[in-house]
């Protein structure tokens, strides 16, 4: 069977894992498109994307255009004569001129069961809304965001303690397998395309750091989901003594305390910092002070008892 020649477009660690698998398959990645290098951190040091780092190691030609509407870039991509393009968390729109230039098409690996959770944050959205399952969808791309025909998909259960980080790693493992299987179907010309039902389409929202501030006027179960969805980024936090404290793990205590105010600390012990919310108690178990490591709350019972005394409203 003829090996496929592939142009790969991706940027993040998630993308890099797929690129790594493709370079070890029978197919050939002849070029990579990734986002331009960007300054990061306090020192604004230029950082290469995970996809670029791997591409350098594997001696794969790299394109880093600021946008893909440039005719010169489009000609360069066309002249590579690739069979197809695979897009995994690239982060930029692919114009029609590129989508239509490959004999085998342009496919995208998306981390949801489309048409549910189109957009940039499908994993976080699935956790935030309490979905019991998510998955990977492989779609043939069109000009609309995540609206192409589905050519393969696989389900993945969401466990009660799953975070965006743990769910991402599960989706990487199953996604790589379904992508390789899809390439086999494409190579054999036995792909079956399925239109998405627009009536069932939902859209995930972009997330910013300001969304991570915990609002105790919210029910405990929603806050607990938020903490899992925002782990490992942007990480939920609350303010005490004008200090932002990150929350990495919390559990719901199904108790209603009508005598306590919203945001009031009702217990502080080895089990956690227990805070009254709009409904039920949220028990903070793993937290992080600025510049410090993540710790279990039991580690600060003695040193921070004046910070989290019972009755304090935060």
UniProtKB/Swiss-Prot annotation:
Native source species: Buchnera aphidicola subsp. Schizaphis graminum (strain Sg)
Protein's name according to its UniProt entry: Methionyl-tRNA formyltransferase
Gene3D superfamilies: Formyl transferase, C-terminal domain (3.10.25.10), Formyl transferase, N-terminal domain (3.40.50.170)
TM regions (residue ranges): none
Origin superkingdom: Bacteria
Alphabetized SUPFAM superfamilies for the sequence: FMT C-terminal domain-like, Formyltransferase
Primary role: Attaches a formyl group to the free amino group of methionyl-tRNA(fMet). The formyl group appears to play a dual role in the initiator identity of N-formylmethionyl-tRNA by promoting its recognition by IF2 and preventing the misappropriation of this tRNA by the elongation apparatus.
Organism lineage string: Bacteria, Pseudomonadati, Pseudomonadota, Gammaproteobacteria, Enterobacterales
Catalytic activity field: L-methionyl-tRNA(fMet) + (6R)-10-formyltetrahydrofolate = N-formyl-L-methionyl-tRNA(fMet) + (6S)-5,6,7,8-tetrahydrofolate + H(+)
Binding site residues for (6S)-5,6,7,8-tetrahydrofolate: 112-115
């Amino acid at each position: 069977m003829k090996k496929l020649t592939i142009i790969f477009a991706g940027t993040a660690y998630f993308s890099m894992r797929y690129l790594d698998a493709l370079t070890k398959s029978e197919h050939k990645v002849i070029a990579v498109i990734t986002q331009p290098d960007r300054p990061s951190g306090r020192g604004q040091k230029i950082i290469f994307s995970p996809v670029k780092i791997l591409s350098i190691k594997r001696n794969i030609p790299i394109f880093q255009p600021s946008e893909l509407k440039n005719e010169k870039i489009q000609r360069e991509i066309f002249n590579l004569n690739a069979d197809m393009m695979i897009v995994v968390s690239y982060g930029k729109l692919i114009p029609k001129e590129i989508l239509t230039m490959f004999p085998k098409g342009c496919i995208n690996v998306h981390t949801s069961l489309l048409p549910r959770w189109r957009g940039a944050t499908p994993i976080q959205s699935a956790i935030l809304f309490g979905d019991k399952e998510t998955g990977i969808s492989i779609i043939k791309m069109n000009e609309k965001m995540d609206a192409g025909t589905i050519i393969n998909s696989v389900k993945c259960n969401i466990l009660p303690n799953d975070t965006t980080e743990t769910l991402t790693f599960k989706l990487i493992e199953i996604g790589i397998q379904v992508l390789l299987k899809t390439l086999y179907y494409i190579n054999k010309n036995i792909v079956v395309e399925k239109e998405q039902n627009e009536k069932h389409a939902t859209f995930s929202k972009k997330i910013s750091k300001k969304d991570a501030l915990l609002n105790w006027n919210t029910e405990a179960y929603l806050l607990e989901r938020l903490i899992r969805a925002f782990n490992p980024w942007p990480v939920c936090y609350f303010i005490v003594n004008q200090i932002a404290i990150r929350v990495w793990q919390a559990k719901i205590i199904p108790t209603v305390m009508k005598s306590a105010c919203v945001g009031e600390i009702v217990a502080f012990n080895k089990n956690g910092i227990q805070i009254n919310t709009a409904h039920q108690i949220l028990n903070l178990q793993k937290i992080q002070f600025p510049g410090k490591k993540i710790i279990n709350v039991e580690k600060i019972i003695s040193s921070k008892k004046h910070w989290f005394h019972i009755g304090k409203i935060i």
